[in-house]
Protein backbone atom coordinates (compact mmCIF):
# COMPACT_ATOMS: atom_id res chain seq x y z
CA UNK A 1 0.00 0.00 0.00
CA UNK A 2 2.94 2.33 0.73
CA UNK A 3 4.03 1.89 -2.87
CA UNK A 4 0.57 2.87 -4.04
CA UNK A 5 0.67 6.02 -1.89
CA UNK A 6 3.99 7.02 -3.43
CA UNK A 7 2.72 6.28 -6.94
CA UNK A 8 -0.44 8.32 -6.38
CA UNK A 9 1.60 11.25 -5.03
CA UNK A 10 3.70 11.21 -8.20
CA UNK A 11 0.58 11.03 -10.38
CA UNK A 12 -1.09 13.88 -8.48
CA UNK A 13 1.96 16.06 -9.04
CA UNK A 14 2.04 15.19 -12.75
CA UNK A 15 -1.72 15.75 -13.07
CA UNK A 16 -1.54 19.22 -11.51
CA UNK A 17 1.38 20.04 -13.81
CA UNK A 18 -0.70 19.01 -16.82
CA UNK A 19 -3.58 21.18 -15.62
CA UNK A 20 -1.23 24.17 -15.49
CA UNK A 21 0.00 23.45 -19.01
CA UNK A 22 -3.54 23.13 -20.36
CA UNK A 23 -4.47 26.46 -18.77
CA UNK A 24 -1.61 28.16 -20.63
CA UNK A 25 -2.92 29.58 -23.96
CA UNK A 26 0.56 29.20 -25.45
CA UNK A 27 0.22 25.40 -25.39
CA UNK A 28 -2.42 25.49 -28.10
CA UNK A 29 -0.03 27.22 -30.47
CA UNK A 30 1.62 23.81 -30.78
CA UNK A 31 -1.13 21.30 -31.77
CA UNK A 32 1.18 18.29 -31.39
CA UNK A 33 2.18 19.28 -27.85
CA UNK A 34 -1.45 20.03 -26.99
CA UNK A 35 -2.48 16.54 -28.16
CA UNK A 36 0.25 14.89 -26.09
CA UNK A 37 -0.71 16.83 -22.96
CA UNK A 38 -4.43 16.14 -23.49
CA UNK A 39 -3.79 12.45 -24.04
CA UNK A 40 -1.71 12.08 -20.89
CA UNK A 41 -4.29 14.07 -18.91
CA UNK A 42 -7.04 11.68 -20.01
CA UNK A 43 -4.87 8.67 -19.07
CA UNK A 44 -4.44 9.97 -15.51
CA UNK A 45 -8.03 11.14 -15.03
CA UNK A 46 -9.48 7.73 -13.98
CA UNK A 47 -6.76 7.34 -11.33
CA UNK A 48 -7.42 10.83 -9.98
CA UNK A 49 -11.17 10.20 -9.86
CA UNK A 50 -10.82 6.94 -7.91
CA UNK A 51 -8.26 8.50 -5.57
CA UNK A 52 -10.65 11.36 -4.78
CA UNK A 53 -13.48 8.91 -4.09
CA UNK A 54 -11.15 6.92 -1.85
CA UNK A 55 -10.18 9.99 0.19
CA UNK A 56 -13.85 10.94 0.61
CA UNK A 57 -14.89 7.43 1.69
CA UNK A 58 -12.06 7.26 4.23
CA UNK A 59 -13.18 10.57 5.75
CA UNK A 60 -16.82 9.43 5.80
CA UNK A 61 -15.84 6.11 7.39
CA UNK A 62 -13.87 7.82 10.14
CA UNK A 63 -16.83 10.09 10.90
CA UNK A 64 -19.31 7.17 10.85
CA UNK A 65 -17.19 5.18 13.29
CA UNK A 66 -17.09 8.12 15.71
CA UNK A 67 -20.86 8.65 15.45
CA UNK A 68 -21.55 4.92 15.90
CA UNK A 69 -20.69 5.23 19.60
CA UNK A 70 -23.66 7.56 20.04
CA UNK A 71 -26.05 6.33 17.33
CA UNK A 72 -26.19 2.66 16.31
CA UNK A 73 -27.57 3.57 12.87
CA UNK A 74 -24.10 4.84 11.98
CA UNK A 75 -22.69 1.37 12.69
CA UNK A 76 -24.49 0.04 9.61
CA UNK A 77 -23.25 3.01 7.60
CA UNK A 78 -19.71 2.29 8.73
CA UNK A 79 -20.02 -1.33 7.56
CA UNK A 80 -21.23 -0.19 4.14
CA UNK A 81 -18.35 2.28 3.84
CA UNK A 82 -15.83 -0.39 4.82
CA UNK A 83 -17.00 -2.53 1.91
CA UNK A 84 -16.87 0.45 -0.45
CA UNK A 85 -13.39 1.32 0.79
CA UNK A 86 -12.06 -2.15 -0.03
CA UNK A 87 -13.65 -2.01 -3.50
CA UNK A 88 -12.08 1.38 -4.22
CA UNK A 89 -8.67 0.24 -2.98
CA UNK A 90 -8.83 -2.76 -5.32
CA UNK A 91 -9.93 -0.52 -8.19
CA UNK A 92 -7.05 1.87 -7.55
CA UNK A 93 -4.58 -1.02 -7.37
CA UNK A 94 -5.87 -2.24 -10.72
CA UNK A 95 -5.45 1.22 -12.26
CA UNK A 96 -1.89 1.43 -10.92
CA UNK A 97 -0.92 -2.06 -12.11
CA UNK A 98 1.72 -2.33 -14.88
CA UNK A 99 0.13 -1.74 -18.27
CA UNK A 100 1.04 -1.46 -21.91
CA UNK A 101 2.52 1.97 -22.61
CA UNK A 102 0.63 2.11 -25.93
CA UNK A 103 -2.85 1.31 -24.53
CA UNK A 104 -4.04 4.88 -25.14
CA UNK A 105 -2.84 4.92 -28.76
CA UNK A 106 -4.76 4.85 -32.01
CA UNK A 107 -3.83 2.01 -34.35
CA UNK A 108 -3.18 0.96 -37.91
CA UNK A 109 -4.67 -2.42 -38.82
CA UNK A 110 -4.04 -4.52 -41.91
CA UNK A 111 -6.22 -7.47 -42.90
CA UNK A 112 -4.86 -9.79 -45.59
CA UNK A 113 -6.46 -12.82 -47.22
CA UNK A 114 -4.26 -15.87 -46.74
CA UNK A 115 -4.40 -19.45 -47.94
CA UNK A 116 -7.74 -20.32 -49.49
CA UNK A 117 -8.17 -18.05 -52.51
CA UNK A 118 -11.58 -16.43 -52.91
CA UNK A 119 -12.88 -18.04 -49.71
CA UNK A 120 -9.99 -16.52 -47.73
CA UNK A 121 -10.86 -13.09 -49.15
CA UNK A 122 -14.51 -13.51 -48.16
CA UNK A 123 -13.41 -14.48 -44.65
CA UNK A 124 -11.14 -11.42 -44.48
CA UNK A 125 -14.24 -9.40 -45.33
CA UNK A 126 -16.08 -11.06 -42.43
CA UNK A 127 -13.27 -10.03 -40.07
CA UNK A 128 -13.41 -6.46 -41.39
CA UNK A 129 -17.16 -6.22 -40.73
CA UNK A 130 -16.68 -7.78 -37.27
CA UNK A 131 -14.17 -5.08 -36.33
CA UNK A 132 -16.32 -2.33 -37.85
CA UNK A 133 -19.33 -3.39 -35.78
CA UNK A 134 -17.25 -3.61 -32.59
CA UNK A 135 -15.77 -0.18 -33.29
CA UNK A 136 -19.22 1.34 -33.86
CA UNK A 137 -20.50 -0.07 -30.56
CA UNK A 138 -17.51 1.23 -28.60
CA UNK A 139 -17.14 4.67 -30.13
CA UNK A 140 -14.06 4.11 -32.29
CA UNK A 141 -13.69 5.71 -35.72
CA UNK A 142 -12.53 3.51 -38.61
CA UNK A 143 -10.99 5.02 -41.73
CA UNK A 144 -10.06 2.93 -44.78
CA UNK A 145 -6.65 4.01 -46.08
CA UNK A 146 -6.15 1.47 -48.85
CA UNK A 147 -8.01 -1.64 -50.03
CA UNK A 148 -8.18 -4.29 -52.73
CA UNK A 149 -11.33 -6.36 -53.31
CA UNK A 150 -11.67 -9.87 -54.67
CA UNK A 151 -13.96 -10.81 -57.57
CA UNK A 152 -16.78 -11.83 -55.20
CA UNK A 153 -16.54 -8.73 -53.03
CA UNK A 154 -14.16 -10.14 -50.44
CA UNK A 155 -11.05 -8.43 -49.10
CA UNK A 156 -7.68 -9.27 -50.59
CA UNK A 157 -5.88 -6.63 -48.56
CA UNK A 158 -7.07 -3.61 -46.58
CA UNK A 159 -5.37 -1.02 -44.37
CA UNK A 160 -7.38 0.76 -41.69
CA UNK A 161 -6.89 3.55 -39.20
CA UNK A 162 -8.83 2.99 -35.96
CA UNK A 163 -8.89 5.83 -33.46
CA UNK A 164 -10.73 7.06 -30.38
CA UNK A 165 -13.18 9.93 -30.76
CA UNK A 166 -11.30 11.70 -27.97
CA UNK A 167 -8.16 10.95 -25.92
CA UNK A 168 -8.67 7.98 -23.63
CA UNK A 169 -6.71 5.82 -21.21
CA UNK A 170 -8.09 2.82 -23.08
CA UNK A 171 -7.54 3.64 -26.73
CA UNK A 172 -7.85 1.48 -29.83
CA UNK A 173 -4.60 -0.36 -29.07
CA UNK A 174 -5.89 -1.55 -25.69
CA UNK A 175 -8.79 -3.30 -27.45
CA UNK A 176 -7.45 -4.43 -30.82
CA UNK A 177 -3.82 -5.31 -29.99
CA UNK A 178 -4.76 -8.96 -29.40
CA UNK A 179 -6.00 -9.36 -32.98
CA UNK A 180 -2.60 -9.55 -34.63
CA UNK A 181 -1.98 -13.04 -36.01
CA UNK A 182 -3.43 -15.72 -38.26
CA UNK A 183 -7.20 -16.26 -38.04
CA UNK A 184 -8.47 -19.60 -39.37
CA UNK A 185 -11.98 -20.35 -40.63
CA UNK A 186 -13.67 -23.74 -41.06
CA UNK A 187 -16.85 -23.70 -43.17
CA UNK A 188 -18.41 -24.65 -46.48
CA UNK A 189 -17.29 -21.97 -48.96
CA UNK A 190 -19.86 -20.32 -51.21
CA UNK A 191 -17.72 -21.56 -54.10
CA UNK A 192 -17.97 -25.20 -52.93
CA UNK A 193 -20.65 -27.14 -54.83
CA UNK A 194 -20.16 -30.44 -52.97
CA UNK A 195 -20.89 -29.04 -49.50
CA UNK A 196 -17.47 -29.92 -48.14
CA UNK A 197 -16.01 -28.04 -45.18
CA UNK A 198 -12.74 -26.32 -46.01
CA UNK A 199 -10.15 -24.43 -43.99
CA UNK A 200 -8.95 -20.98 -45.01
CA UNK A 201 -7.08 -18.21 -43.26
CA UNK A 202 -6.59 -14.47 -43.05
CA UNK A 203 -3.80 -12.51 -41.40
CA UNK A 204 -4.28 -9.44 -39.21
CA UNK A 205 -1.48 -6.99 -38.38
CA UNK A 206 -1.96 -4.32 -35.71
CA UNK A 207 0.37 -1.42 -34.95
CA UNK A 208 0.07 1.38 -32.37
CA UNK A 209 0.15 4.69 -34.22
CA UNK A 210 2.74 7.25 -33.03
CA UNK A 211 1.31 10.60 -31.91
CA UNK A 212 3.44 12.28 -34.58
CA UNK A 213 5.47 10.96 -37.52
CA UNK A 214 8.43 12.87 -36.08
CA UNK A 215 8.37 10.55 -33.05
CA UNK A 216 9.89 7.85 -35.29
CA UNK A 217 13.18 8.50 -37.04
CA UNK A 218 12.72 8.13 -40.80
CA UNK A 219 15.54 9.17 -43.12
CA UNK A 220 14.08 10.68 -46.30
CA UNK A 221 17.04 9.21 -48.20
CA UNK A 222 15.89 5.72 -47.22
CA UNK A 223 12.40 5.94 -48.70
CA UNK A 224 11.16 5.78 -52.29
CA UNK A 225 7.90 7.54 -53.11
CA UNK A 226 5.86 6.48 -56.15
CA UNK A 227 2.62 8.10 -57.26
CA UNK A 228 -0.09 6.54 -59.37
CA UNK A 229 -3.74 6.96 -60.28
CA UNK A 230 -6.25 6.03 -57.58
CA UNK A 231 -8.48 3.09 -58.40
CA UNK A 232 -12.24 3.54 -58.46
CA UNK A 233 -15.50 2.02 -59.67
CA UNK A 234 -16.08 4.63 -62.35
CA UNK A 235 -18.40 7.61 -62.57
CA UNK A 236 -17.93 11.20 -61.46
CA UNK A 237 -16.19 10.27 -58.20
CA UNK A 238 -13.15 8.71 -59.87
CA UNK A 239 -9.90 10.55 -59.15
CA UNK A 240 -8.23 11.06 -62.54
CA UNK A 241 -4.99 12.54 -61.15
CA UNK A 242 -1.93 10.70 -59.89
CA UNK A 243 -2.89 11.22 -56.25
CA UNK A 244 -2.34 7.72 -54.83
CA UNK A 245 0.98 7.26 -53.05
CA UNK A 246 3.20 4.22 -52.48
CA UNK A 247 6.11 4.60 -50.06
CA UNK A 248 8.85 1.96 -49.86
CA UNK A 249 11.22 1.93 -46.89
CA UNK A 250 14.36 0.62 -48.54
CA UNK A 251 16.25 -0.77 -45.49
CA UNK A 252 13.32 -2.94 -44.34
CA UNK A 253 11.38 -3.44 -47.57
CA UNK A 254 8.17 -2.21 -45.91
CA UNK A 255 5.70 -0.90 -48.50
CA UNK A 256 2.79 1.39 -47.61
CA UNK A 257 0.11 2.68 -49.96
CA UNK A 258 -2.64 5.24 -49.47
CA UNK A 259 -5.22 6.41 -51.99
CA UNK A 260 -8.18 7.46 -49.86
CA UNK A 261 -7.48 11.20 -49.80
CA UNK A 262 -8.19 13.45 -52.77
CA UNK A 263 -4.72 14.97 -52.96
CA UNK A 264 -1.26 13.51 -53.32
CA UNK A 265 -0.01 15.62 -50.39
CA UNK A 266 -2.70 14.23 -48.06
CA UNK A 267 -2.09 10.64 -49.18
CA UNK A 268 1.66 11.04 -48.69
CA UNK A 269 1.17 12.42 -45.17
CA UNK A 270 -1.17 9.56 -44.26
CA UNK A 271 1.15 6.95 -45.77
CA UNK A 272 4.03 8.37 -43.72
CA UNK A 273 1.92 7.95 -40.57
CA UNK A 274 1.32 4.29 -41.42
CA UNK A 275 5.01 3.78 -42.19
CA UNK A 276 5.94 5.36 -38.85
CA UNK A 277 3.56 2.99 -37.06
CA UNK A 278 5.03 -0.06 -38.80
CA UNK A 279 8.62 0.99 -38.14
CA UNK A 280 7.84 1.71 -34.49
CA UNK A 281 6.28 -1.76 -34.15
CA UNK A 282 9.28 -3.35 -35.88
CA UNK A 283 11.71 -1.57 -33.55
CA UNK A 284 9.74 -2.71 -30.50
CA UNK A 285 9.59 -6.32 -31.71
CA UNK A 286 13.36 -6.33 -32.25
CA UNK A 287 13.93 -4.83 -28.79
CA UNK A 288 11.54 -7.33 -27.19
CA UNK A 289 13.21 -10.25 -28.97
CA UNK A 290 16.63 -9.11 -27.78
CA UNK A 291 15.43 -8.59 -24.21
CA UNK A 292 13.64 -11.94 -24.16
CA UNK A 293 16.71 -13.78 -25.49
CA UNK A 294 14.65 -16.11 -27.60
CA UNK A 295 11.74 -16.63 -25.19
CA UNK A 296 8.29 -16.99 -26.71
CA UNK A 297 6.74 -13.55 -27.07
CA UNK A 298 3.86 -12.56 -24.84
CA UNK A 299 0.26 -11.99 -25.93
CA UNK A 300 0.78 -8.32 -26.65
CA UNK A 301 3.58 -9.03 -29.16
CA UNK A 302 2.83 -12.59 -30.18
CA UNK A 303 4.37 -14.21 -33.23
CA UNK A 304 2.16 -13.24 -36.15
CA UNK A 305 3.03 -16.45 -37.98
CA UNK A 306 1.10 -18.46 -35.41
CA UNK A 307 -2.58 -19.30 -35.65
CA UNK A 308 -4.28 -17.42 -32.83
CA UNK A 309 -7.96 -18.17 -33.37
CA UNK A 310 -10.33 -20.54 -35.19
CA UNK A 311 -13.85 -19.68 -36.35
CA UNK A 312 -15.84 -22.92 -36.78
CA UNK A 313 -19.04 -22.22 -38.73
CA UNK A 314 -20.71 -25.68 -38.50
CA UNK A 315 -20.43 -25.71 -34.70
CA UNK A 316 -20.96 -21.94 -34.24
CA UNK A 317 -17.77 -21.97 -32.15
CA UNK A 318 -14.90 -19.55 -31.70
CA UNK A 319 -11.63 -20.74 -30.11
CA UNK A 320 -8.73 -18.51 -29.08
CA UNK A 321 -5.73 -20.82 -28.87
CA UNK A 322 -3.51 -18.50 -26.82
CA UNK A 323 -5.63 -18.63 -23.67
CA UNK A 324 -7.88 -21.66 -24.28
CA UNK A 325 -10.98 -19.48 -24.68
CA UNK A 326 -13.97 -21.20 -26.33
CA UNK A 327 -17.52 -20.00 -26.88
CA UNK A 328 -20.43 -21.25 -28.98
CA UNK A 329 -21.61 -17.82 -30.08
CA UNK A 330 -19.74 -17.31 -33.34
CA UNK A 331 -22.72 -15.53 -34.87
CA UNK A 332 -22.68 -12.93 -32.08
CA UNK A 333 -18.90 -12.52 -32.27
CA UNK A 334 -19.06 -11.84 -36.01
CA UNK A 335 -21.70 -9.23 -35.18
CA UNK A 336 -19.11 -7.37 -33.11
CA UNK A 337 -19.81 -8.95 -29.70
CA UNK A 338 -16.15 -9.27 -28.73
CA UNK A 339 -16.33 -8.02 -25.14
CA UNK A 340 -16.09 -11.42 -23.39
CA UNK A 341 -13.16 -12.49 -25.55
CA UNK A 342 -11.29 -9.19 -25.15
CA UNK A 343 -11.90 -9.21 -21.38
CA UNK A 344 -10.37 -12.70 -21.14
CA UNK A 345 -7.38 -11.64 -23.24
CA UNK A 346 -6.81 -8.51 -21.14
CA UNK A 347 -6.97 -10.60 -17.95
CA UNK A 348 -4.35 -12.99 -19.34
CA UNK A 349 -2.12 -10.10 -20.36
CA UNK A 350 -2.46 -8.45 -16.94
CA UNK A 351 -1.59 -11.71 -15.17
CA UNK A 352 1.55 -12.05 -17.30
CA UNK A 353 2.56 -8.46 -16.59
CA UNK A 354 2.10 -8.87 -12.85
CA UNK A 355 4.09 -12.11 -12.91
CA UNK A 356 6.88 -10.46 -14.89
CA UNK A 357 6.85 -7.44 -12.55
CA UNK A 358 7.25 -9.71 -9.53
From Swiss-Prot:
PROSITE patterns linked: RF_PROK_I (PS00745)
Ranges in a coiled coil: none
Modified residues (N5-methylglutamine): 236
Annotated SMART domains: PCRF (SM00937)
Gene3D superfamilies given in the database record: 3.30.160.20, 3.30.70.1660, 6.10.140.1950
GO CC terms, sorted: cytoplasm
Protein's UniProt name: Peptide chain release factor 1
Natural source organism: Corynebacterium efficiens (strain DSM 44549 / YS-314 / AJ 12310 / JCM 11189 / NBRC 100395)
Designated gene of the protein: prfA
Amino acid sequence: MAGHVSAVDDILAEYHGLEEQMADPALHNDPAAARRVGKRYSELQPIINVHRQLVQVRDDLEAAREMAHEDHEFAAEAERLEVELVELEEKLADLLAPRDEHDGDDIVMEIKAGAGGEEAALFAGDLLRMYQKYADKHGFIIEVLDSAESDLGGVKDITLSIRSRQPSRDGAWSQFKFEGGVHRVQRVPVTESQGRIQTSAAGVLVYPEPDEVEDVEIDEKEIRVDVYRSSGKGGQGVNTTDSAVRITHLPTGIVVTCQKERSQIQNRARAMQVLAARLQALQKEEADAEAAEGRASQIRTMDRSERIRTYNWPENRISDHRIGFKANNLDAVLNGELDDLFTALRAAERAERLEADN
